[in-house]
Amino acid sequence: PSFYFAVSTLFYIFASNTNHDNLFGKMIYVSLPTTQTRRLSFYLAMEEFVARNINTADDCFFMWQVEPSVIFGRNQLIENEVNIDYCRQNNIKTYRRKSGGGCVYADMNNIMFSYITQSENVSLTFDRYINMVAEMLRSLHIPAEATGRNDIMIHGRKVSGNAFYHIPHHSIVHGTMLYDTNMQNMVATLTPSDEKLVSKGVKSIRQHIALLKDYISLSLEEFKQYTKDNLCSSEITLTDADILAIEEIEREYLTQEFIMGSNPRYTKVNKMRIEGVGELEARLEIKGGVIKSVNILGDYFLVGDINADIIAPLIGKPYDLQHISLSLPDHTELTIRNLNKYQLTELLYGKQENLSV
């Protein structure tokens, strides 16, 4: 039988908070039985395992670090986001996650945060989480603010980018915390569009990011301990059997089909950048004036079922403004975060004068 739904035997260890008062809540910290560094995909699978198998009303949290890796969003096309040749030449691994959002570089000087909650409202959960992390940073006298779609900023520069997705009965939020990083690798591996950089008011990736080490005297390990002590009030340690179950889940993340994603044929491409939504690219296959396939790429965030809500109703319909408008739901923002029906219609069909949907 699959380990996917394995029932865990867990050891509860109450975290020591003798040096710090717990500031922000009573999350459970989830630890591994050993401290070895694992593949990035393992930690993504660990999030799923925790969500599906740890039976607690409390939220769960853990931190992790990886060897140089690139991780891109569920709806992104790898060749649009990553310098694949540089990654291969420098042994930088590439992974796809199940959440939306953009592409990030991670290494051992960059801390990754994972947060798992029973909350069903992913948008509300997301906002609450990034504000909690920003508040924790401010407790260290770091002028951090939760801004934009998914970022935590210091003086207008990003120190943390986050993404989220939903599985039955749980929401998962994960993100970066830039303590330090190999700037050469970050700049060389990521290939954001000129439009994305301009929208941030910068000319390069380096201009857009902040590093925690420039704002605090704590070492990386000291910062991790401070975070754990102040966000969590208890701790569990997974078992060896749990590790086997996580590795079973991880297999999906390692398949070429999952990493490369689907890239169906297309005859028409429309691109837009929408404030509060992200960069979007619609690829449609139109034959005889009829929509045969639709693929919406980008760093947007899904909060609903895009296939059932948006794509399936379009397939087989004539490619014209009226049929697109009639096929789309009235509240597309319930599927793609912050994207209204007018904007989605424009993405699919192109900008029209006096467009009414």
Stretch-by-stretch model annotation:
Residues 4, 11-13, 22:
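Short, positively charged and aromatic/hydrophobic N-terminal segments
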Residues 24-78, 164, 209-279, 283, ...:
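Active-site loop/lid in soluble adenylation, ligation, and acyl-transfer enzymes
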Residues 81-103:
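Active-site cofactor/substrate anionic-group-binding motifs, chiefly glycine-
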Residues 98-117, 195-213:
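Residues forming anionic-ligand binding surfaces in small-molecule and nucleic-acid pockets
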Residues 110-150:
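Contiguous, small/hydrophobic- and glycine-enriched helical/loop subdomains that border
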Residues 133, 160, 168-262, 308-357:
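Long, positively charged amphipathic alpha-helical accessory segments at protein N-termini or as interdomain linkers
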Residues 142-155, 238-245:
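Short, surface-exposed recognition loops or helix-turn segments adjacent to catalytic cores
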Residues 163-164, 177, 280-300:
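Short beta-strand elements
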